[in-house]
Amino acid sequence: MRFLSKFFSLIAFAMFCTTIFSANAEAAPSIKYRVTHVRLIDQGELEVQGYFENEGDRDAYAKCITLDLTLIADNGQEMWSNSGIEHYIDVYVPADGALEYTFYVQDEEIPEYHGKFRYRWHTHTNWDTSAG
């Protein structure tokens, strides 16, 4: 009888812990901006094309993209590089969804270049669950 009492107490405690800890595992958004193409517009300006992807299970708003970008000429020479480029926005991204987004970077150091080039990038996206 004593064993049965301990067994049921253990089961009740396990159910209690499961209820408490599962309530804390709240749904959360996870938004990332991915660069798909970089295009040189003119000397001093480039266009960054990409999309936001929300891998979470809750809707949210992308607030800021921080971009590190390096342009590399066809011959392997670095043409331009900048890190910490911030672009502030307020864009709705649905849960498990994606949204195309293009923005422009202006910097007098961006060269005018008409040949082929490649690019390396890294982004960090800040988001919030409310607009504004």
Can you say where each PLM-predicted feature lies in the sequence?
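Terminal connector regions
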Residues: F103-G132
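Low-complexity, acidic Ser/Thr/Pro/Gly-rich terminal tails and inter-domain linkers that flank the onset
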Residues: A25-Y51
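Bacterial N-terminal signal peptides that target proteins for export
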Residues: M1-I11
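Short acidic/proline- and small/hydrophobic-mixed sequence motifs that coincide with surface turns
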Residues: D59-A62, M79
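Short aromatic-acidic-glycine turn motif
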Residues: L69-N82
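Intrinsically disordered, low-complexity Pro/Gly/Ser/Thr-rich segments with frequent PxxP/GP/PP motifs
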Residues: S81-I110
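Asparagine-centered strand-capping/turn motif at beta-strand->loop junctions
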Residues: F52-D57
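Bacterial N-terminal signal peptides
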Residues: S9-T19
